[in-house]
């Protein structure tokens, strides 16, 4: 089941945050990027406190999550997927995105086999991604202005 956060708010910007039951938000994010070229953001962004409210994270669970994070294990860190829609986006483009999300959910068991999860970063990495390519693109982000 796909859940849109704050779905009761009808007047909103073209930004939708959602999650799918029993599928890690960062796995969906990387699959939509790698398979369809759809750029999304996974995690809780800068809305951790609001996220606790939206996801019904109580104090006890929050404490358990932060204790795990403090020990270097981010695997319990909650999050969602954020989709931003551009005003010039067509209905067909939106339907393609919806179709890609549906395909990802339908094929998750097969497609996730191509990825490994790192609990220290809470990210998924393609198991066949060459190290030299990874080194090159991470270098781009380290360039100083």
Give the ranges of each region predicted by the language model:
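A common structural junction motif
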Residues: 35-41, 101-109
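Short, conserved charged micro-motifs
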Residues: 23-29, 88-96
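Short secondary-structure transition/capping segments
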Residues: 51-56
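Short, low-order "capping/linker" segments at domain edges
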Residues: 57-64, 122-142
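Surface-exposed acidic, glycine/proline-enriched linker/cap segments
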Residues: 58-76, 80
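Conserved small-domain helix->loop->beta segment predominantly found in fold-type I
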Residues: 1-30, 41-45, 50, 69-75, ...
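Structural preference for beta-strand elements that scaffold enzyme active sites
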Residues: 15, 39, 80-82
């Amino acid at each position: 089941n796909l859940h849109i956060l704050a779905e009761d708010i009808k007047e909103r910007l073209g930004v939708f945050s959602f999650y799918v039951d029993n599928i890690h938000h960062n796995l969906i994010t990387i699959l939509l990027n790698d398979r369809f070229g759809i750029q999304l953001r996974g995690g809780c962004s800068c809305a951790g406190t609001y996220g606790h409210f939206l996801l019904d994270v109580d104090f006890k669970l929050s404490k358990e999550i932060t204790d795990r994070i403090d020990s270097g294990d981010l695997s319990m860190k909650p999050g969602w997927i954020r989709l931003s829609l551009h005003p010039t986006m067509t209905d067909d483009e939106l339907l393609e995105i919806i179709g890609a999300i549906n395909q990802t959910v339908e094929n998750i068991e097969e497609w996730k086999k191509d990825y490994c999860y790192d609990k220290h970063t809470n990210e998924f990495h393609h198991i066949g991604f060459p190290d030299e390519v990874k080194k090159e693109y991470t270098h781009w982000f380290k360039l100083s202005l």
